[in-house]
Amino acid sequence: MSKIQNHQKVVLVGDGAVGSSYAFAMAQQGIAEEFVIVDVVKDRTVGDALDLEDATPFTAPKNIYSGEYSDCKDADLVVITAGAPQKPGETRLDLVNKNLNILSTIVKPVVDSGFDGIFLVAANPVDILTYATWKFSGFPKEKVIGSGISLDSARLRVALGKKFNVSPDSVDAYIMGEHGDSEFAAYSTASIGTKPLLDIAKEEGVSTDELAEIEDSVRNKAYEIINKKGATFYGVGTALMRISKAILRDENAVLPVGAYMDGEYGLNDIYIGTPAVINGQGLNRVIESPLSDDEMKKMTDSATTLKKVLTDGLKALEEK
């Protein structure tokens, strides 16, 4: 590990609900000695920095301040949460044109600063914006990671934990594919305490229809939260903290993320949700899950959906 040193610096671009939740999670964990907040609304970044620094006596010493894109020059990690929020009744893919425009104004000044660290992207539609960040930046694919299905997989583990009366962190299960409506639960590889989930479900009389209902509830949970409180932010903010921790502490942790496909699952030239090894160099390698035939079809269909929207979105951006 050559880039990550004892003094670690993170720059957050986008200080909305997700960004500020991520910043608070990072402050709580004491991860990174220097944390910079960048947003077009300068007063908010100053206010958040002042508010967050008041948490440091209870957590760990940290220099938190409002900054500019030039502060990215010596950063280890740049986290992008900036973008138009998802509104009630709106899908993540509906956001593509608005947020591709916003992203195009972010990546260039970050790169122009001399930044050579790792990008972590969370703005929606995250798989498409992660791919666009990779394209706009010219960075190696390993140094651009999406939050992908990290939050969705957490939601699945919460739901399965409730169903089978175990702690969510004892459930080894992944949502895969798009972070969005074409995502799916990879039940064939899921387990609890090394025992296959499908075997446990059969023994406990949990039907395939019930498992499908759990999958649907996970897929639609964001819409439920958005309809009730306007946005989701605590879960994704914590998921971003976990990925950041794996990078900054060089953990070689297997996490659900949005990763570039280079032949895995028969896919190429796309970012999509899968387990992967994350360390100080970024995305070390994809863990290609042994999906069932039905799940493999869902993965392919999800990629097809993403590629069409990605192609149309980038074309529209070029025509502007």
Curated annotation (Swiss-Prot):
This is L-lactate dehydrogenase. It catalyses: (S)-lactate + NAD(+) = pyruvate + NADH + H(+). It comes from Pediococcus pentosaceus (strain ATCC 25745 / CCUG 21536 / LMG 10740 / 183-1w). Substrate binds at residues 86, 92, 124-127, 152-155, 232. CDD domains: HicDH_like. Catalyzes the conversion of lactate to pyruvate. PANTHER family: L-2-HYDROXYCARBOXYLATE DEHYDROGENASE (NAD(P)(+)), L-LACTATE DEHYDROGENASE. Pfam families: Ldh_1_C, Ldh_1_N. GO terms for cellular component: cytoplasm. GO terms for biological process: glycolytic process; lactate metabolic process. The modification Phosphotyrosine is found at residue 223. Pathway: Fermentation; pyruvate fermentation to lactate; (S)-lactate from pyruvate: step 1/1. Its EC number is 1.1.1.27. Homotetramer. The keyword Oxidoreductase applies. NAD(+) binds at residues 18, 39, 44, 69, 83-84, 105, 122-124, 147. It comes from the Bacteria. NCBIfam families: L-LDH-NAD (TIGR01771), PRK00066.1 (NF000824). The active site is at residue 179. One of its GO terms (molecular function) is L-lactate dehydrogenase activity. Keywords: Cytoplasm, NAD, Oxidoreductase, Phosphoprotein. Belongs to the LDH/MDH superfamily. LDH family. It is found in: Cytoplasm. It is an enzyme of class 1 (oxidoreductase).
